[in-house]
Amino acid sequence: MPNFRILGMFTGIIEKIGTITDVIQSGSNLQFWVNSPLSDELKIDQSVSHNGVCLTIEEIKDGSHRVTAIQETLQKTNLGAWEKGTLVNLERCLPFHGRIDGHLVQGHTDVTAVCLEIEDKSGSWVFQFQYPSEFAQLLIEKGSVCINGTSLTVFDLTANTFKVAIIPYTYNNTNIHTVSPGDRVNIEFDMMGKYFARMMELRSKD
């Protein structure tokens, strides 16, 4: 039989927060040790979303697991800024029988966005982010976007900025509470939007 691998999918619903306990330079790659409540439940070669980036579990030891980010990943995401103590959003792959409580996420970061402003609404928070305008066709008002692995809803959309509203549960149970103005977050746009944009691009060339 041919040797193939079914790629994992995620939903943008964070299961646990992990903590970076060690960062190891390995050639052009970075290896990260992550301590988390999920680590002992994982398996070697399992795909797990870390801040929205699909990484492969390489080693598990004493309530922690190790993953590697290659140079391309470090260039396209915020993983290069991780250090000891950094909090990381974790989500295991969606099982075939599972519910899609967020939206379908591949674990492939498209671009990073910069946090511009945080408004405290006395019970919720509104975060504004700036992203490269060439991706504007991939966002719609009230559409889905994945920020550091978390499925959120877009509003107040412009050509290069958007806002998301954060409820207390999300604020306390993801690493969004660690984001400050000026910080970069990983962005994955909605998969269906990307396929539609690609289809329209190809049609325009006919």
Language-model regions, residue ranges each:
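Conserved loop->alpha-helix
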Residues: F4-D206
